[in-house]
Amino acid sequence: DRCIWPKEGFSIYWNIPTHFCHNFGVYFKEL
């Protein structure tokens, strides 16, 4: 899974709950 912050212009990969990502950025469920 990945979370992207458009304002900061970078993305990171998560292994944490998706709701946490939604609070801070845009969540993408990668297949």
From Swiss-Prot:
EC number: 3.2.1.35
Chief subcellular location: secreted
One GO molecular-function entry: hyalurononglucosaminidase activity
Record keywords: Allergen, Disulfide bond, Glycoprotein, Glycosidase, Hydrolase, Secreted
Catalytic reactions on record: Random hydrolysis of (1->4)-linkages between N-acetyl-beta-D-glucosamine and D-glucuronate residues in hyaluronate
Assigned GO CC terms: extracellular region
Protein name according to UniProt: Hyaluronidase
Species of the source: Vespula maculifrons
